[in-house]
Curated annotation (Swiss-Prot):
Residues 1-92 form the Core-binding (CB) domain. It comes from the Bacteria. Site-specific tyrosine recombinase, which acts by catalyzing the cutting and rejoining of the recombining DNA molecules. The XerC-XerD complex is essential to convert dimers of the bacterial chromosome into monomers to permit their segregation at cell division. It also contributes to the segregational stability of plasmids. Keywords: Cell cycle, Cell division, Chromosome partition, Cytoplasm, DNA integration, DNA recombination, DNA-binding. Forms a cyclic heterotetrameric complex composed of two molecules of XerC and two molecules of XerD. This is Tyrosine recombinase XerD. One of its GO terms (cellular component) is cytoplasm. It is found in: Cytoplasm.
Length: 304
């Protein structure tokens, strides 16, 4: 069977049988199409003709850059390999091949990359840069509610914009957030985030709403706020705050986790709040706090 035909069947399987989110499916589709393009350029149309050496060459080409395209980082090439592995595993499961040629291909070596975070003062500067008094516009109040919720709950941007009005209408002390793979988790809904969301619901959302969407966060046309628009909100807020940092919505999630650990929270509690399936993913934040402690020690200890 042609690899591209099998890839389409596999994506359908992921959508129907695995229930992957639209965003995750979009990422898988992009990566598997890139893999199929590479295979066809190498004269490997049939899934049965591919060997382990071919998969290894694909990963190396990703790191070098394919056909003048920008080279991928080790982590991005590793994710692309995961998709290629998934396709070959599916080929074996469907009886199209006798062996999984990608199973033993190693991902590119990665150095430890610590996520960017904000200090507690920088978070305060970011939030306070958004007007919230009587001069605040409906968009200002929406933006403040979004940023407060992202930092206050550690939600991913896709999770935050996926919230409905009914999820927060009674201002519960905890929020039920739907994450990757439609998995739900419970996170505390703190007083500052509640206050910002309440003010948005009372003073701003009715002005934005055209009565056609149940989404919590709306754009100026009354539709659900998109991921791209949410990124733009944060970029505008960073400029207002005068912060000379490259800050994304995920930076607030990283900061949420780091500040919890610095405050003494158990790493497994933080794992649950973030919705990580493995504590190993969460433990990267313990490296951040350890690095911070070392910097304080170097500056303060007489024997440093």
């Amino acid at each position: 069977m042609k690899a591209r035909v099998l890839a389409k069947t596999w994506l359908t399987h992921l959508a129907v049988e695995r229930g992957l989110s639209a965003n995750t499916l979009s990422n898988y589709r992009r990566d598997v199409e890139r893999y199929c393009d590479w295979l066809e350029a190498a004269g490997l149309d049939d899934i049965r003709d591919i060997t382990t050496a071919h998969v290894e060459s694909y990963v190396k080409d990703l790191r070098r850059g394919i056909d003048g395209q920008q080279a991928l980082s080790a982590s991005s090439a590793g994710r692309a390999l995961i998709v290629a592995r998934g396709l070959h595993k599916f080929a074996l499961m469907e009886g199209e091949v006798a062996a999984d040629v990608a199973a033993d291909v190693s991902p590119p070596a990665m150095g430890r990359h610590l996520p960017d975070t904000l200090s507690i003062n920088e978070v305060a500067l970011l939030i306070d840069a958004i007007p919230h008094s009587d001069i605040a516009t409906p968009v200002d109040l929406r933006d403040r509610a979004l940023v407060e919720l992202l930092y206050g709950t550690g939600a991913r941007i896709s999770e935050a914009i996926g919230l409905a009005v009914d999820d927060v209408s009674e201002m519960p002390e905890v929020l039920r957030i739907t994450g990757k793979g439609s998995k739900q988790r419970i996170v505390p809904f703190g007083s500052m985030a509640q206050q910002a969301v309440r003010e948005y619901l009372v003073r701003a959302r009715p002005a934005l709403s055209k009565g056609k969407s149940h989404a919590l966060f709306l754009n100026q046309r009354g539709g659900p706020l998109s991921r791209q628009s949410a990124w733009a909100v944060l970029k505008k807020t960073v400029e207002r705050a005068g912060l000379d940092k490259d800050i994304s919505p995920h930076t607030l999630r990283h900061s949420f986790a780091t500040h919890l650990l610095e405050g003494g929270a158990d790493v497994r509690v933080v794992q649950e709040l973030l919705g990580h399936s493995s504590v190993t993913t969460t433990q990267i934040y313990t490296h951040i706090t350890a690095d911070s402690l070392r910097e304080v020690w170097r500056g303060a200890h007489p024997r440093a």
